[in-house]
Design a protein with these regions (language model features):
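Substrate-binding pocket helix/loop in short-chain dehydrogenase/reductase
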Residues: 61-62, 69-74
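C-terminal helical subdomain
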Residues: 138-151, 161-188
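Rossmann-fold cofactor-recognition segment
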Residues: 17-31
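Catalytic loop of short-chain dehydrogenase/reductase
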Residues: 99-124, 129-130, 134-137
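Conserved NAD(P)H cofactor-binding loop of Rossmann-fold oxidoreductase domains
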Residues: 53-59
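A short, exposed helix-loop element centered on a Lys and neighboring polar residues
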Residues: 85-86, 130
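Conserved glycine-rich Rossmann-like NAD(P)H-binding loop of the short-chain dehydrogenase/reductase
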Residues: 1-10
């Protein structure tokens, strides 16, 4: 099951990924998000793995971005993570197994001048994930925050850095492979 705003993107992913289903959802709308999670549970049962890969960022110094933009970043990067984890973690706890994986980026570790609107929310996301881990790891649930310190090879990043060589960009399939590995790593 996959959640995204863009229905066309979801359809493309459904076509690419066997036995997958996409659910269009605006993560900032709590009622809509809860309904979407309920539909996923109805269609597939409770997930054994929850990967939070949603992100919203704002560029510009603190004088340039609005409080509304900052709130929107928090709603997607932090609040949606919290809401979904609250819905799926209790069943993982009952089973004594599961994984919650959160992807983030370098801004979770530092606040550059023009990334305050993103960095503050990614840092909060990282700390929230660490809190999940301290509570859930003893209950058998693996929790990890993965920092992606690279430009992901996407259409918009290629447009943003048109002069960069191919090896400047990290491949989405390579990220997915590492996420899979971390999700399934042994407890030792």
């Amino acid at each position: 099951a996959m959640i995204a705003r863009d229905k066309e993107r979801l359809k493309s992913l459904e076509d690419e990924l066997e036995d997958s289903k996409g659910y269009s959802c605006e993560l900032r709308n709590q009622e809509y998000l809860n309904s979407t999670i309920d539909n996923i549970i109805k269609d597939f049962g409770y997930p054994d793995v929850f990967i939070h890969n949603a992100v919203r960022g704002t560029r510009g110094n603190f004088l340039e971005f609005t409080s509304e933009e900052l709130q929107s970043n928090f709603d997607i990067n932090v609040i949606a993570l919290h809401r979904i984890a609250q819905k799926v973690a209790p069943e993982m706890i009952k089973k004594g197994k599961g994984a919650i994986i959160v992807t983030g980026n370098t801004s979770a570790h530092r606040g550059k001048a023009n990334f305050g609107g993103t960095a503050s929310t990614k840092a909060a996301q990282k700390i929230l994930t660490e809190s999940f881990a301290r509570y859930l790891n003893p209950k058998g649930i693996h929790v990890a925050y993965i920092t992606i310190d690279a430009a992901i090879d996407l259409e918009w990043t290629r447009k943003a850095w048109p002069d960069k060589p191919d090896d400047f960009f990290i491949q989405p399939d390579d990220i997915a492979s590492e996420v899979w590995h971390i999700t399934h790593q042994s407890k030792s």
